[in-house]
Amino acid sequence: MAEHPEEVGLNSMRRVAQDAGVKPATITRLTKILGFPQYDALREPFRQRLRTRSPEFASKLQHVQNLSESDEDSLFADLRAQEISNVQHSLSDENYPHMDAAAQIMNDSRRVYVLGLRGAYAPAFLFHYAYQLFQDNSQLLDTRAGMFADQLRGIGPEDSLLVISFSPYAQHTIDAVEYAAEAGAKIVAVTDSIVSPAASAAAHTIVTKNQSPSFYHSFTGALAVVQALITLLVTKAGGDAVKIVEEAEKQLSRISAYW
């Protein structure tokens, strides 16, 4: 538990016991020995740590500034290598079955809800924009005008939610995941860990690397996954998708959308 505090904060007692290779009764006994009335009370400090963990952007920024003063070429080389690694990991053979299954879930959905807040809004918007060019059943969730809860109204078992989220996880994102799960929607999570709260109820989790030598985490891996999902969805879309794209192109041409 000391070595894997995130798992304790996010998972049930049965799951923690399974991962530790012990029976649930062992965790129950440990809970009482430590003076907690029940497992939820033992788990609360671990959950609190997850909620209050600081992203430490300021200290990382200072570190980058110190590096750049001494060796900008080395910093750029490290950045390039890390971004390449992020993409390679995200588009790995291990991730492909999860991406293909996730695309099938969304292809079979009545409605596809798309969610990414704060920094994760960019890959979420890219997915929504590309997807709506050949399908008409996408709903991009956001917090504008306080309409977040309204946008989720009606989500159910015939729908899916694509959620993109990385530590530090936005509270509205986790709330939406929990709501969608309770409503029976199928969740596809693009996130940084299999124990991410965004993946707690996911049918499929696509883990992407987001490390960066810069002060802010990278979304290059998430963008690569979005591109892969869109490509897979196009292959599953059928002939109607071509007609929808043709109509979209005509409409954009009529309003002179492009220079």
Language model: regions and residue ranges:
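A short, charged, Gly/Pro-tolerant segment at domain boundaries
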Residues: 239-259
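Amphipathic alpha-helical interaction segments
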Residues: 15, 41, 101-104, 122, ...
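HTH-adjacent hinge/linker in prokaryotic transcriptional regulators
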Residues: 3-10, 14-98
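Glycine-rich phosphate-binding loops that contact phosphosugars or nucleotide phosphates
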Residues: 104-224, 228-237
